[in-house]
């Protein structure tokens, strides 16, 4: 999991997905400290009704796909972005994140997603930015989260919480 790699600085080959995982981290941005909640939700269709409950108060979304599996990028376009916009609206920033960039060097598969194509899809589906990273090597990982925190800090809700915080889903 990308969130496990970021929060615990570890990579598990046999990570078992759950319906809903969350982590809390403290982040220092622009001379302010923020309590950040990070959520990972199950991707199976049968969990949409549960998953959507966490969308309305997210400050930013990371929509992830595998750089070595084009089908996962198409799922971002056909499933994840429409679902996010349906339940969270059009104003919440979305970052498109290509994962497993450590596998690109040794992959000769037709399923590999080029950076150019990923950026094109990100623009087409209305993502604020595109990043690639690796949970295994941590290459690009900090940048993904730093930029996401910065994007999420600017999101305003009708009722602001008393303490500065950011929720990334």
Q: Which stretches of residues belong to each language-model region?
A:
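Polybasic, Ser/Thr-rich amphipathic helices
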Residues: 162-169
């Amino acid at each position: 999991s990308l969130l496990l790699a970021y929060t615990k600085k570890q990579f598990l080959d046999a990570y078992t997905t759950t319906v809903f995982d969350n982590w809390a981290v403290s982040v220092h941005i622009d001379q302010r400290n923020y309590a950040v909640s990070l959520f990972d939700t199950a991707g199976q269709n049968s969990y949409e009704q549960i998953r959507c409950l966490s969308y309305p108060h997210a400050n930013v979304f990371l929509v992830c796909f595998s750089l070595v599996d084009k089908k996962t990028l198409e799922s971002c376009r056909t499933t994840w972005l429409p679902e996010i916009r349906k339940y969270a609206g059009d104003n919440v920033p979305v970052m498109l994140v290509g994962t497993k960039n450590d596998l690109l060097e040794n992959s000769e598969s037709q399923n590999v997603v080029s950076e150019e194509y990923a950026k094109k899809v990100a623009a087409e589906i209305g993502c604020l930015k595109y990043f690639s990273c690796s949970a295994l090597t941590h290459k690009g990982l900090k940048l993904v989260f730093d930029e996401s925190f910065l994007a999420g800090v600017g999101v305003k809700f009708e009722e602001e919480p008393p303490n500065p915080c950011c929720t990334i889903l």
